[in-house]
């Protein structure tokens, strides 16, 4: 019975907090939340916004996968992806934030806006450990860049 009340509170609130090893928290809001026990996942649907101390994520759906210790392992953002980082906006069709590898992979119609510059490609890999970003084209279209003066 206590479990039913807990799930009901989570559904009504549609907010999730998770403490990571580095003491950062994720705050997530959406129109709807579905929690699955085995494997432990949270699916946020509709007008989804998620943030931690550094990143802001927007999308139609966000899937949160947890490890065996109930720590967030992967965050997948699906459709109308927007990621806001310090002085940078990233757009795409899908993004995967791997908290263990500390990278973000954005795919499908990737657009990056930073300091007036605009980059377009099919895939972006952001390495948060080494502070590097790699944008790739595909066989039909190369990477394009518009540099601001």
Task: Enumerate the predicted regions with their spans.
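Mature-chain termini and adjacent capping regions
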Residues: 1-149
């Amino acid at each position: 019975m206590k479990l039913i009340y807990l799930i009901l509170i989570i559904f009504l609130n549609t907010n999730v907090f998770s403490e990571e090893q580095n003491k950062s928290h994720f705050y997530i809001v959406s129109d709807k939340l579905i929690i699955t026990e085995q494997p432990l996942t949270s699916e946020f649907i509709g007008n989804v916004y998620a943030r931690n101390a550094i990143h802001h994520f927007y999308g139609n759906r966000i899937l949160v996968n947890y490890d065996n210790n109930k720590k967030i392992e992967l965050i997948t953002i699906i459709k109308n992806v927007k990621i806001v980082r310090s002085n940078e906006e990233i757009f795409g069709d899908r993004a995967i934030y791997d908290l263990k590898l500390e990278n973000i992979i954005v795919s499908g119609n990737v657009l990056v806006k930073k300091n007036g510059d605009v980059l377009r490609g099919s895939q972006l890999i952001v390495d948060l450990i080494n502070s590097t970003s790699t944008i790739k084209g595909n066989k039909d279209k190369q990477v394009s860049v518009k540099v601001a003066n």
